[in-house]
Amino acid sequence: MVANSGGGLTDADGGPVRHIPVLLKEVLEALAPAPGKLILDGTFGAGGYTSAILAAGADMIALDRDPTAIAAGQSMVAAHAGRLTLIQSQFSQLADHAPQGGLDGVVLDIGVSSMQLDEAERGFSFSKNGPLDMRMSASGVSAADVVNHAKLADLIRIFVFLGEEKQAPRIAHAIEKRRAEAPFVTTRDLAGLIEIVTPRKAKDKIHPATRVFQALRIFVNDELGELAQALFAAERALKPGGRLVVVTFHSLEDRIVKKFFADRSGRAGGSRHMPMVHERLATFDPIGKPMISASDAEAEINPRARSAKLRAGLRTSVQAEAADLSIFDLPNLASLGKLGG
């Protein structure tokens, strides 16, 4: 990816890039792509990172659970014959698509892509009216299923744990009352109700529906569970000296990545579920600063970068440890009642 004569970006094929990859310079510095290296992009999206890594000479495996992203990326595959393999898959399964201990790098850009937000029919954005869907693939329950059929207590838990929404009870009660009259069908249906229940104040920096939409998206796609499993998978797939680079966009995701690197650094630690443990050999060493955020200049150009955080680790030669989800202290939503139950 390079700057074009108009000051914008072009991909490696010379075409315009709509999506602006967040923290691109910092990602490349941490990942260190080079000819002869094999790197996996677990979140292909619009191909921003993949294009830049290919331009640096590395070969790529790229994954995305969204079939639309896979279809859109076929031109990039054709332009880099033999150097890019594009696979429809959840990134939690990345170890199934790479030689065990054979990757030089893994990059994960967590969260919804700008391409998905731009398409109203995907139902991710409250600013664009479309079906209340939010699924990154066609399978599983949709956001409309959750909003129309989940029990009141379950809605509150989803909004509190996954959206950190302080007005969760008020919003959930309003949803329950409204759906008894007519089901929620579109993003505007839900966003409009939330605007009425919790009107935006002058000091508010975000839309009142932001946290509820975030919570529904995370729940529908099991994003926190996917991220946790992807980190364990990357640990197995990286060779000694391989690099894991993760970009997150809100505190729930960043907390998981931070806890993973802390646990895998060999430092003693524990949680409310696990006692303190003795120091052990590290499977990852830190790369640079513990956390990197976007500069003011980048945030001005690309508003999506304002909340971005980058964490990276260098794989050691120590054998990968068993996957243990308890280290993340994730909210237990597995006990939610069946929709409509």
Curated annotation (Swiss-Prot):
The encoding gene: rsmH
- Say which species the protein is native to: Rhizobium rhizogenes (strain K84 / ATCC BAA-868)
Which sites bind S-adenosyl-L-methionine? 47-49, 64, 91, 109, 116
Source species, domain of life: Bacteria
Q: Which HAMAP family match?
A: 16SrRNA_methyltr_H
| Listed GO MF terms | rRNA (cytosine-N4-)-methyltransferase activity
- Alphabetical list of Gene3D superfamilies matching this protein: Putative methyltransferase TM0872, insert domain, Vaccinia Virus protein VP39
EC number(s) in its UniProt entry?
A: 2.1.1.199
Q: Name one GO biological process term.
A: rRNA base methylation
According to its UniProt entry, the function of this protein is described as: Specifically methylates the N4 position of cytidine in position 1402 (C1402) of 16S rRNA.
Give the catalysed reaction(s), semicolon-separated: cytidine(1402) in 16S rRNA + S-adenosyl-L-methionine = N(4)-methylcytidine(1402) in 16S rRNA + S-adenosyl-L-homocysteine + H(+)
The cross-references to Pfam families, in alphabetical order and at most eight, read: Methyltransf_5
Q: What class of enzyme is it?
A: transferase
What is the name listed in the Swiss-Prot or TrEMBL entry for this protein?
Answer: Ribosomal RNA small subunit methyltransferase H
A GO cellular component annotated for this chain's UniProt record is:
cytoplasm
Q: What family, per the record?
A: Belongs to the methyltransferase superfamily. RsmH family.
InterPro entries noted in UniProt:
RsmH (IPR002903), SAM-dep_MeTrfase_MraW_recog (IPR023397), SAM-dependent_MTases_sf (IPR029063)
Where in or outside the cell? Cytoplasm
SUPFAM superfamilies recorded: Putative methyltransferase TM0872, insert domain (SSF81799), S-adenosyl-L-methionine-dependent methyltransferases (SSF53335)
Which keywords fit this entry according to its UniProt record? Cytoplasm, Methyltransferase, rRNA processing, S-adenosyl-L-methionine, Transferase
